[in-house]
């Protein structure tokens, strides 16, 4: 009998709901990337686990932020490097950005970033040498692989176990998105990654955009040489990066058209920008006190991301000087040496609740490195930005926000205290910046489904249907000349030329018959009269 006060059908409905949930539960292999990439991916993984799926996450034993969780199974990968090695390679890369910003992909990946990527690639080799782990993964009979393609290993695992895959990324290096998803990317109006161009390019910029694409095709195979060698060794057959990317079932990107410029998409591409945004939580007593003490001037939130903890002393002092010139209270997440000229209005903290502070009514501006997480938290909370991009897609993100009139971009190498002061005063006092960011916030929030729910749906979709082959374009099966219809153009051109040739020959023959014969008759007639 149903409990008193409850509808008789309620327990039955609950049982049916739970039964259907368990019936749909599956097994998911997750191959993430460390750092800020993991923060948003973890949200999806945890929700999938809460929905009853058996989730297994493979992570290296040495990492910054990835660790054990009670919500899903973690398999540790034994690696040769230590945490000190990881920190050394990343700090070497990050510190170089304060000396000379490596804007182009060639310089970024070939120089300071090369050692860091080689370290990541080595993790994949270690994984396949762990026969016990590989056998466990093989026997687990997963329904799909949810992966970050940054280090390529997830793609190799998906191909090795012949599993459908869902890619989760902020963007794909090189031209492999064009080839892997067969997604058109016309260089005439789709800026290449790291180019800092907009979708409205001058002739000179379009030339450089085309050259960037050509450089990608020439250089990227060299950069991913180690990854391809590992894949070929593991799969026991020669493969290319295109071979690894082509089988992807769903491409999931941490962006949307509020940030991204309008461009072509494929049916298996999903935009989930702002997945890290959430309703601001009440501040702790410490931060609430800081905010309340700011008075009518409000606060400015300053963070260069979780991966940048130190700034060269001279640059830190320039920044501190600029911050001391504005009336707002500055909350600066910084773990480096305290600048000697730090003003009273600037508070250094080792950690801050960034989203919660940006969601406070007293937030006036946001100084950010333009990472996708920070950019979207700024958009969601409607806070204008002063952007100081350092590397990677941060340059492109800053350009997009600046183009939309929602912030000001500064070159961290060349900026002075005056530049930072003026930029802050501009975004705080010029109402257009606040109006523009509020408009973007309104556009971003006006959607039929939350990004997190959309991401979970598509992962489960691939698990249920063992992939999404009906969304795979036939372009994957065409050769390059078939894709561009060069064979059709050649065939039609041959027909046209043949017809023109026949018509020409026919006309020439007719002319000879008509006019050539009359000439001979007249000539013969004249000779007789003489």
UniProtKB/Swiss-Prot annotation:
One of its GO terms (molecular function) is enzyme binding. GO terms for biological process: cellular response to 3-methylcholanthrene; coumarin catabolic process; liver development; steroid metabolic process. Disulfide bonds: none annotated. UDP-glucuronosyltransferase (UGT) that catalyzes phase II biotransformation reactions in which lipophilic substrates are conjugated with glucuronic acid to increase the metabolite's water solubility, thereby facilitating excretion into either the urine or bile. Essential for the elimination and detoxification of drugs, xenobiotics and endogenous compounds. Catalyzes the glucuronidation of endogenous steroid hormones such as androgens and estrogens. Produces dihydrotestosterone (DHT) diglucuronide from the DHT after two subsequent glucoronidation steps. Belongs to the UDP-glycosyltransferase family. This is UDP-glucuronosyltransferase 1A8. It is a single-pass membrane protein. It is an enzyme of class 2 (transferase). Pfam families: UDPGT. Its EC number is 2.4.1.17. It catalyses: glucuronate acceptor + UDP-alpha-D-glucuronate = acceptor beta-D-glucuronoside + UDP + H(+); 17beta-estradiol + UDP-alpha-D-glucuronate = 17beta-estradiol 3-O-(beta-D-glucuronate) + UDP + H(+); 17alpha-estradiol + UDP-alpha-D-glucuronate = 17alpha-estradiol 3-O-(beta-D-glucuronate) + UDP + H(+); estrone + UDP-alpha-D-glucuronate = estrone 3-O-(beta-D-glucuronate) + UDP + H(+).
């Amino acid at each position: 009998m149903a409990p008193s006060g409850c509808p008789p059908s309620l327990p039955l409905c609950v049982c049916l709901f739970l039964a259907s949930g368990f019936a749909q539960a599956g097994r998911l292999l997750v191959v993430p990337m460390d750092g800020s990439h993991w923060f948003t991916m973890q949200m999806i993984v945890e929700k999938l686990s809460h929905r009853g799926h058996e989730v297994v996450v493979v992570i290296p034993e040495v990492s910054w932020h990835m660790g054990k969780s009670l919500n899903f199974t973690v398999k540790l990968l034994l690696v040769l490097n230590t945490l000190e090695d990881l920190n050394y390679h990343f700090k070497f890369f990050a510190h170089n950005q304060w000396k000379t910003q490596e804007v182009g992909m060639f310089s970024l990946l070939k120089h300071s970033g090369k050692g860091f990527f080689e370290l990541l690639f080595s993790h994949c080799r270690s994984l396949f040498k762990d026969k016990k782990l590989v056998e466990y993964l093989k026997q687990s009979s997963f329904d799909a692989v949810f992966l970050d393609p940054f280090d390529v290993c997830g793609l190799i695992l998906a191909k090795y176990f012949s599993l459908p895959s869902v890619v989760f990324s902020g963007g794909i290096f090189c031209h492999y998105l064009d080839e892997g998803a067969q997604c058109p990317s016309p260089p005439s109006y789709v800026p290449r990654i790291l180019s800092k161009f907009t979708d409205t390019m001058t002739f000179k910029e379009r030339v450089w955009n085309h050259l960037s694409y050509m450089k990608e095709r020439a250089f990227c195979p060299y950069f991913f040489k180690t990854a391809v060698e590992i894949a070929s060794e593991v799969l026991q057959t020669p493969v290319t990066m295109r071979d690894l990317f082509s089988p992807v079932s769903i491409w999931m990107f941490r962006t949307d058209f509020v940030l991204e410029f309008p461009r072509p998409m494929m049916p298996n591409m999903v935009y989930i920008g702002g997945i890290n945004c959430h309703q601001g939580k009440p501040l702790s007593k410490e931060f609430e006190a800081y905010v309340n003490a700011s008075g009518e001037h409000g606060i400015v939130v300053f963070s260069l991301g979780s991966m940048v903890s130190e700034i060269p002393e001279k640059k830190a002092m320039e920044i501190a000087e600029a911050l001391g010139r504005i009336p707002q209270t500055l909350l600066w997440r910084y773990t480096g040496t305290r600048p000697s000229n730090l003003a009273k209005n600037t508070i250094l903290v080792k950690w801050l609740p960034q989203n919660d502070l940006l969601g406070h009514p007293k937030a006036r501006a946001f100084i950010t490195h333009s990472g996708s997480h920070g950019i979207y938290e700024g958009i969601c909370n409607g806070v204008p930005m002063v952007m100081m991009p350092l590397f990677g897609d941060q340059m492109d993100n800053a350009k997009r926000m600046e183009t939309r009139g929602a912030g000001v971009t500064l070159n961290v190498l060349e900026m002075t205290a005056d530049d930072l002061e003026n930029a802050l005063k501009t975004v705080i006092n010029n109402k257009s910046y606040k109006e523009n960011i509020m408009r973007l916030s309104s556009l971003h929030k006006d959607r039929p489904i939350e990004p997190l729910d959309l991401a979970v749906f598509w992962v489960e979709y691939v698990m249920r249907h063992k992939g999404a082959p009906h969304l795979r374009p036939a372009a994957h099966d065409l050769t390059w000349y078939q894709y561009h219809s060069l064979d059709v153009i050649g065939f039609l051109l041959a027909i046209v030329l043949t017809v023109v040739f026949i018509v020409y020959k026919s006309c020439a023959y007719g002319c000879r018959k008509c006019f050539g014969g009359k000439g001979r008759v007249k000539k013969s007639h004249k000779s007789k009269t003489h």
